[in-house]
A protein has these predicted regions:
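Extracellular/luminal regions of secreted and cell-surface proteins that mediate adhesion/ECM remodeling
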Residues: 5, 21-22
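Extracellular recognition modules
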Residues: 7-13, 110-112
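Short, solvent-exposed loop/turn segments at the edges of extracellular beta-sandwich modules
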Residues: 13-18, 116-117
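Short, isolated positions in well-ordered beta-strands
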Residues: 20, 143, 291-293
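Short, compositionally biased
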Residues: 25-245, 319, 344-346, 350-357
Length: 357
């Protein structure tokens, strides 16, 4: 008998307690759950810090079930320090859960849930890194010690602490890079430093077209941009991110994208410049603690990595009620604008905060 089968011994009994039929064995079954550590929480990204088997429930942030899932597979993954040893494998869907195995190599991956036609119905970011620490800033907001997607919080600017890029309001990350791409075109580094699952017929690409949220979910690797080079949405929607965590918030469980008010303490950020007045690094200190901000740049309206030497971070806030614009923090040289304007189609880093709401 399998571990998921149960035997029920049943007999019919009359009102006076007499048996009216013989007892019978009735065998039933209950579908076994997937093995592995349950990552818990409802989120669009999950932190994994040790090798092993893991699983999570296929729900949105609000707890609602995601329908039409038939299977799951990995979509893309970073190559890590050893490209012959994939960072994630054995992705499987069963009974409202997705399971996978992590090799222990740090990096990032996206897992996609698929319908019967192999179309993506939802996807999740798997962030393989040591457990991020937190730090309280001057205004009382508690921040993560690294950019979303970074595998290091150490001082310096290198690909381990750079993090991933996000178009405002989208839950899925875009791989970064290590140098400007205005000559090579968008995603030149992403194409060499990530492995893409050939079974899912996806690739890193830029598309000059405004779309709706449903299309962005189906094509998480497509960097869309509308006709005005401002928003990736055909019709703007300022509610996709908020100071209450939404279904499209990309931060892990227990964290969310900060509002413009919550991130204002960073105006005290400091910088070290090189001989060309480009920032070598930025840092913020409060109450004898210091955290670092790599000068990584951003992705522009063509999806290209530009402005290396600056820090560009999204907030969840709309920018002064301007359509299709949101507030982003811009650190460039000794200049810091905590109310910088950013078209929602551009790609910027995120520094998640502890979600106390």
């Amino acid at each position: 008998m399998s571990s998921s089968e149960y035997v029920i011994i049943a007999a019919a009994v009359s009102a006076d307690g007499l048996y009216t039929s013989d007892a019978k064995n009735i065998t039933t079954s209950q579908e076994a759950k997937l093995p592995g550590t349950n990552l818990g929480g409802n989120a669009n990204s999950y932190i994994v810090s040790e090798k092993g088997q893991y699983k999570f429930e296929t729900t949105k942030v609000n707890g609602s079930e995601i329908s039409d899932i038939n299977s799951a597979d990995w979509l893309w993954m970073t190559k890590g320090n050893n490209s012959s040893n994939p960072i994630i494998s054995d992705v499987v869907y069963k009974s409202g859960e997705i399971g996978f195995t992590v090799s222990g190599v740090e990096g990032n991956s996206v897992i996609a849930a698929l319908d019967t036609k192999n179309n993506i119905v939802w996807s999740w970011h798997i962030w393989i890194t040591d457990v991020p620490q937190t730090m309280e800033y001057e205004n009382g907001t508690v921040f993560m010690d690294r950019m979303l997607g970074a595998t290091s919080a150490d001082r310096g600017s290198n690909k381990e602490n750079y993090g991933l890029f996000y178009q405002w309001g989208r839950k899925d990350p875009f791989y970064g890079g290590t140098k400007d791409e205005y000559k090579t075109g968008a995603f030149a580094t992403a194409n060499t430093e990530t492995t893409i699952n050939p079974a899912l017929n996806m690739k890193w690409r830029y598309t000059k077209k405004g779309v709706d949220i449903e299309t962005s979910i189906k094509e998480p690797m497509n960097y869309f941009m509308g006709d005005k080079n401002i928003d990736w949405l055909a019709n703007e929607d300022p509610s996709l991110w908020n100071n209450i965590k939404t279904d499209y918030d990309p931060c892990p469980a227990g964290y969310r994208v900060p509002s413009a008010t919550e991130i204002e303490s960073i105006k005290q950020i400091e910088a070290e410049l090189d001989e060309n007045d480009y920032a070598k690094e930025f840092w913020y200190t409060w109450n004898n603690e210091t955290t670092y901000y790599p000068s990584y740049g951003c992705r522009d309206e063509k999806g290209e990595l530009v402005m290396e030497g600056g820090v560009f971070m999204w907030t969840s806030s709309q920018h002064l009620n301007q359509s299709s614009y949101s507030t982003r923090v811009v650190c460039w040289g000794f200049f810091t604008d905590i109310n910088g304007i950013g078209g929602r189609g551009t790609g910027n880093n995120i520094r998640c905060i502890v979600d106390c709401k």
